[in-house]
């Protein structure tokens, strides 16, 4: 199978980052751990169904796709454009042998993705093993036109899921009953298993608590329960999006109402600062200001680059001086916590623009009461 044009571009970008880092070869890890299969899909077109896989990328020559032998009949191995496909009893041993003669071997997924037995095999080699997550992510952070089209498709699917949640919402139902139709809709629209659907709920009247939990199949929702469904999906192409808004039929608490005002201000700040030339620190500073000015705490990370892996570098945070470029894509989701322990949390996917940021969904920044669906 010939390399698609965008695949050639991706490989050139990754090899450029390898040269900059002085690597002789690179191992790219992927597993079925939700959201962490995408680096393999990005480089070779193979969708991991079960277990894990690696792409071996030499600085020169053709890459190889490596599977554990027990995964021989798991997944469509003909979907990749990489010709050399290897099934190894211990993939790390095969990778170590292929990397023989290298001085510096990079590994994407070294800390979170790579199988322990394969790391042990690699570590026994005569080369230096180097973590390469940040460099890999930065090399793929600017999206091509084809990739942006896939991102927009994922956002449309994500937004459709939110409207399905809203249509299903009714006090007296369980959290899971409200979520279930959206999960089905996501699958109908091509997400497969690429979904991370949680909820922040169980808070004081008119509020939600800050912990992410699986929607309960037994807990019935009241009108004063603020529901913050965390809707995160990967579209048919494997590109991820995160879009959600709070839902509650009753009246928000004073703390929730104040956090909502800050969220509206944050959205305008994000639009102004998420542009070419800003740094990740600039974005964090501008976006956190409406919350900090009101004395709120920020819990979960403010935002992060998002692509075919759910969470990519750069992260939006204090002290991160990575400069942003047009057509990078970020998930932004300030995790705002009030003094009474209640929380407000919304997700939005943004494109870095030349002059300002582009919010990719059409959803208003507000608390939806169910009448809109």
Predicted regions and their residues:
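Active-site neighborhoods and metal-handling regions in enzymes and metal-associated proteins
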Residues: 1-373
């Amino acid at each position: 199978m010939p390399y698609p044009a965008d695949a050639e571009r991706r490989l050139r970008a990754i090899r450029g980052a390898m040269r900059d880092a002085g690597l002789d070869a690179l191992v790219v890890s992927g597993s079925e751990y939700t959201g962490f299969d995408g680096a393999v899909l990005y480089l070779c077109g193979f969708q991991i169904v079960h277990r894990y896989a690696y792409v071996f990328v030499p600085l020169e020559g053709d890459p190889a796709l490596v599977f554990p032998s027990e995964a021989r009949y798991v997944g469509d191995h003909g979907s990749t454009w990489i010709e050399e496909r290897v099934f190894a009893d211990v993939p790390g041993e095969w990778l170590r042998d292929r990397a023989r003669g290298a001085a510096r071997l990079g590994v994407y997924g070294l800390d979170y993705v790579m199988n322990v037995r394969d790391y042990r095999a690699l570590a026994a080699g005569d080369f230096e093993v180097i973590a390469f997550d940040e460099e890999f992510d930065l090399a793929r952070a600017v999206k091509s036109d084809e990739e942006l089209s896939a991102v927009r498709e994922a956002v449309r699917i994500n937004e459709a899921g939110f409207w399905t949640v809203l249509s299903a919402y009714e006090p007296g139902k369980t959290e899971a009953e409200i979520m279930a139709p959206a999960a089905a809709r996501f699958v109908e629209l091509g997400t497969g298993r690429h979904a991370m659907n949680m909820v922040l709920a169980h808070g004081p009247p008119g509020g939600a608590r800050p912990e992410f939990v699986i929607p309960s199949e037994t807990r019935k929702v009241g009108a004063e329960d603020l529901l913050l469904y965390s809707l995160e999906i990967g579209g048919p192409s494997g590109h991820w999006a995160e879009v959600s808004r709070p839902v509650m039929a009753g009246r928000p608490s004073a703390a929730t109402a104040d956090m909502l005002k800050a969220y509206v201000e944050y959205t305008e700040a994000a639009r102004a600062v998420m542009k070419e030339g800003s740094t990740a620190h600039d974005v964090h500073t501008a976006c956190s200001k409406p919350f900090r000015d009101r004395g709120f705490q920020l819990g979960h990370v403010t935002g992060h680059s998002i692509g075919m892996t759910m969470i990519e570098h750069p992260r939006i945070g204090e002290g991160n001086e990575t400069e942003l470029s047009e057509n990078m894509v970020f998930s932004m989701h300030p995790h705002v916590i009030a003094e009474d322990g209640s929380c407000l949390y919304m997700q939005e996917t943004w494109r870095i623009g030349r002059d300002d940021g582009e919010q990719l969904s059409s959803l208003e920044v507000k608390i939806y009461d169910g009448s809109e669906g």
